[in-house]
């Protein structure tokens, strides 16, 4: 995605840029920052975090609220943790569909100040022409969980033990293949 040299001339292009600036919480006109925030999240990190945060899809939050990334909220739709301390008021964000959970996760990593180091390291890898992999970035996610460095060690372990790095170069295509079944 190269935005810096492009002149946006059509109304549709301008509308798209305005929408992305809002979505990624970027100051008006800062296309360089938009490019940094719109970059990929390595597949292995997303899979490892979803597995860890949702108990491999078996947690109450995943089953009742499509919450596979364990994102906290204090004012949104959510599910209260059963073992939450009495002086705490957070909930786990709840979603109507899994796709909404994934989009919120993407927006969280790409916009929240707690993940600035994640975005900076990812951008450094991009600028050096290096592969952007989960194992290269997990150390930047210490703020994702209260356990800090221990959390990043667990993510690395999940990625390695389950060979999630094998999925780094996978590309999903938006197509339908018709298959005939023999009766």
Residue map of PLM features:
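Catalytic cores of secreted/periplasmic lytic hydrolases that degrade extracellular macromolecules
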Residues: 1-48, 52-183
């Amino acid at each position: 995605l190269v935005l810096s040299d492009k002149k946006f001339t059509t109304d549709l292009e301008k509308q798209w840029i305005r929408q992305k600036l809002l979505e990624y919480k970027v100051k008006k006109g800062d296309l360089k920052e938009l490019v940094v925030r719109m970059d990929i999240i390595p597949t292995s990190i997303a899979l490892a975090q979803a597995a860890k945060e949702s108990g491999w899809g078996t947690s109450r939050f995943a089953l009742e609220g499509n919450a596979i990334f364990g994102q906290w909220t204090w004012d949104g739709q959510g599910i209260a943790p059963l073992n939450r301390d009495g002086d705490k008021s957070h909930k786990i964000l709840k979603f109507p569909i899994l796709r909404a959970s994934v989009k919120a996760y993407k927006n969280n990593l790409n916009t929240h100040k707690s993940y600035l180091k994640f975005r900076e390291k990812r951008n450094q890898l991009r600028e050096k022409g290096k592969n952007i992999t989960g194992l290269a970035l997990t150390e930047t996610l210490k703020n994702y969980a209260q356990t800090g460095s221990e959390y990043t060690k667990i993510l690395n372990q999940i990625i390695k033990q389950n060979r999630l790095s094998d999925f780094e170069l996978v590309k999903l295509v938006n197509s339908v293949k018709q298959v005939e079944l023999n009766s």
